[in-house]
Amino acid sequence: MESWDLIIIGSGPAALRAAVAAADSGTTPVLIESSGIGAGNSNLDLAGMAASIDEISSSAHRDDTITAGGESTDKIAAARVCGEGVGVLAELERWGLVLRRRDGGLPHASQVSGHSMPRLTGCGDATGRNTTRILEEQAMKRGVLRRADLRAMSLVMDGNQVRGITAYDMSSGEVVGIQSKAVILATAGHQGIWSGSANGAGLGSSLAASAGISLSGLANNPTHPLTVRGTDLNISIDVLGSGGRVRKSSGEDVAS
């Protein structure tokens, strides 16, 4: 039976960054990308990365995140993620991500819904694609194996300890077992169940729930505000942050 230190299920920036971190720590990971290599959820519509680049601290960013997320927000996680924003952005720049710039050389920051300050940085509508490419390069440099021929079906549990996964091998048509010491679910969200697959089909949530793992924070489900009806096309939210306007056929503003 195939065996790994770590199985990472997902194909977007979160999965790729987890693989890079695992490899750097001396762990041997494998990426299970059932949607196909390069088909990560954030490839097209990632608007940018929020970072407190013009603020003394990340406390206001943390507070905005908690307010937007509601009472179920994990405050400790919000503080950690917001606090790491500037460092993560600098790391991606060192690895080759070319950000939009403003006069003076600092990254351009847009103000978007949910933020009290301009924080959204990135590469315009190429942010998702470029971020994924940079992380793919880093994963390749570390020799991370990426499997696009498998689709995760279930987690294999031994009490409260995960022992691996069962997966459908699309090349052979067989169901196979893969052992691992740990599994990271880095899939897209599940809001696409209501709004379209481009916003996440809920694979990670489904795998966890089916294995008896308690889910939390599901009361508030984010939805992409600029999804074109009847399609899986998401328009980058940075369109609004850069001064764009959404109007009804009457000319009345819907958002700006």
State what each model feature region is.
Residues L46-A47, S72, S110-R119, A186-A188:
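Gly-rich Lys/Arg/Thr-decorated short loops/hinges at beta-loop-alpha junctions or inter-strand turns
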